Swiss-Prot record:
GO terms for molecular function: NADH dehydrogenase (ubiquinone) activity; quinone binding. It comes from the Eukaryota. Its EC number is 7.1.1.-. It comes from Solanum tuberosum. Belongs to the complex I subunit 2 family. This is NAD(P)H-quinone oxidoreductase subunit 2 A, chloroplastic. NDH is composed of at least 16 different subunits, 5 of which are encoded in the nucleus. The gene is ndhB1.
Length: 510
């Protein structure tokens, strides 16, 4: 009798949970339609892989790219709709979240064609690679719209788990295994630190998990200036710092960049920063509204350390990927300036604008590195000497992307940094802006050093890798070159589209 009662209660409880989930999906599912497209794409990939042979490989790329493009289209159609909170407060859709989701989808869309030839040459498993990329993209999109502490913790873990698997995808490479181990251990430690900070925030607010309700809870409990909030701020800053990889939370970055497959590095170098920046902006701006002076100070220290250490250490690197790793640490210092400036002086708009340009500059650079690596098998900066004599198109493309990363006019990086530094100057962050200007000059030095090597014509400086370089045709159907051309154009012709981009970024502010 007791067993029958327990069984009936279990069935009733299960039915209630199922009906509630069905109700949420039915009424709130339209608000995550772009994410649903990616989920449908993932299911299709699994079905095709389990029922087909090697001849259907092009279909896998087609489905992945199509699902990403359709997801971008769905986001664009939803633009300017009223902000909505769905799934019992777990998820929020507004223009601010959607523009970061757009940036993540754009990164993934450009990274897939960048990976095609690399996967074929290295004979890596294709389906799993695409599954991990799409799942990581999905996690990043949910993180951008996360509205409570649980979702903010679970979504980046979805992204991180796929990142660990992607970084160790070349299992036979010792460097890849070492990078994955460091990435996994430090990622696990940072996640535990982050959730510990969330526990302090949860307790101080009286048991609230939604971001806006946490603010109301802190007011009701009069805990908004308590030591517990300061402890929460420190732990959460450290936890988010791992995702953003500013100094001194950058130790994993150079090793992971060097040991991971180059297309994976290209993907992680932009998507992780975009998703973490969106999350950091909302966390600092909403729950820590009453502690703005404290988190401003913390982020200023991180920005200064990142800009100085990242750019100075990049000078000494001999590997292109390690150089770009330290360069990305310096770049995140510039992005943090936009987070500190905030909404009042177009700080968020300048951050979004700079991130859009950073995506094109960084992915364009990595596309050149992937192409050069496949044709020569080397990543050493010294081995790029004389590339212009063998492949002028690739050398010029790499030079333009590097100059744009350095911020030389009239390239995209110059306009992005100009807008970002101008907003910082208007907000009174004079010291930060001066540090940013000085470190930008330092970055131009090591970028120009590489460009000088590219353009050299001295036979004694040209390495055997370039002497034996296989010249590519002027017009090629190579998917890597397609991504490279798109990124180079976006990095070099910003003047026509600068004002509309700024207007869209300003319109996205919450």
């Amino acid at each position: 009798m007791i067993w029958h009662v327990q069984n009936e209660n279990f069935i009733l409880d299960s039915t209630r949970i199922f009906m509630k989930a069905f109700h949420l999906l039915l009424f709130d599912g339209s608000l995550i339609f772009p994410e649903c497209i990616l989920i449908f794409g993932l299911i299709l990939l699994l079905m095709i892989d389990s029922t087909s042979d090697q001849k259907d490989i092009p279909w896998l790329y087609f489905i992945s790219s199509t699902s990403l493009v359709l997801s971008i289209t769905a986001l664009l159609f939803r633009w300017r709709e009223e902000p909505m909170i769905s799934f019992s407060g777990n998820f929020q859709t507004n223009n601010f979240n959607e523009i970061f989701q757009f940036l993540i989808l754009l990164c993934s869309t450009l990274c897939i064609p960048l990976s095609v030839e690399y996967i074929e040459c290295t004979e890596m498993a294709i389906t799993e690679f695409l599954l991990f990329v799409l799942t990581a993209t999905l996690g990043g999109m949910f993180l951008c719209g996360a509205n409570d502490l649980i979702t903010i913790f679970v979504a980046p873990e979805c992204f991180s788990l796929c990142s660990y698997l992607l970084s160790g995808y070349t299992k036979k490479d010792v460097r890849s295994n070492e990078a994955t181990m460091k990435y996994l251990l430090m990622g696990g430690a940072s996640s535990s630190i982050l959730v510990h900070g969330f526990s302090w925030l949860y307790g101080s607010s009286g048991g609230e998990i939604e971001l806006q309700e946490i603010v109301n809870g802190l007011i009701n409990t009069q805990m908004y200036n308590s030591p517990g909030i300061s402890i929460a701020l420190i732990f959460i800053t450290v936890g988010i710092g791992f995702k953003l990889s500013p100094a001194p939370s950058h130790q994993w970055t150079p090793d992971v960049y060097e040991g991971s497959p180059t297309p994976v590095v290209a993907f992680l170098s932009v998507t992780s920063k975009v998703a973490a920046s969106a999350s950091a902006t909302r966390i600092f701006d909403i729950p820590f509204y009453f502690s703005s002076n404290e988190w401003h100070l913390l982020l200023e220290i991180l920005a200064i350390l990142s800009m100085i250490l990242g750019n100075l250490i990049a000078i000494t690197q001999t590997s292109m990927k390690r150089m770009l790793a330290y360069s990305s640490i310096g770049q995140i210092g510039y992005v943090i300036i936009g987070i500190i400036v905030g909404d009042s002086n177009d700080g968020y708009a300048s951050m979004i604008t700079y991130m859009l340009f950073y995506i094109s500059m960084n992915l364009g650079t990595f596309a050149c590195i992937v192409l050069f690596g496949l044709r020569t098998g080397t990543d050493n900066i010294r081995d790029y000497a004389g590339l212009y004599t063998k492949d002028p198109f690739l050398a010029l493309s790499l030079a333009l992307c590097l100059l744009s990363l350095g911020g030389l006019p009239p390239l995209a990086g110059f306009f992005g940094k100009l807008y970002l530094f101008w907003c910082g100057w208007q907000a009174g962050l004079y010291f930060l802006v001066l540090i940013g200007l000085l470190t930008s000059v330092v970055s131009i030095y090591y970028y120009l050093k590489i460009i000088k090597l590219l353009m050299t014509g001295r036979n004694q400086e040209i390495t055997p890798h370039v002497r034996n370089y296989r010249r590519s045709p002027l017009r090629s159907n190579n998917s890597i070159e397609l991504s490279m051309i798109v990124c180079v154009i976006a990095s070099t012709i910003p003047g026509i589209s600068m004002n509309p981009i700024i207007a869209i970024a300003q319109d996205s502010l919450f």
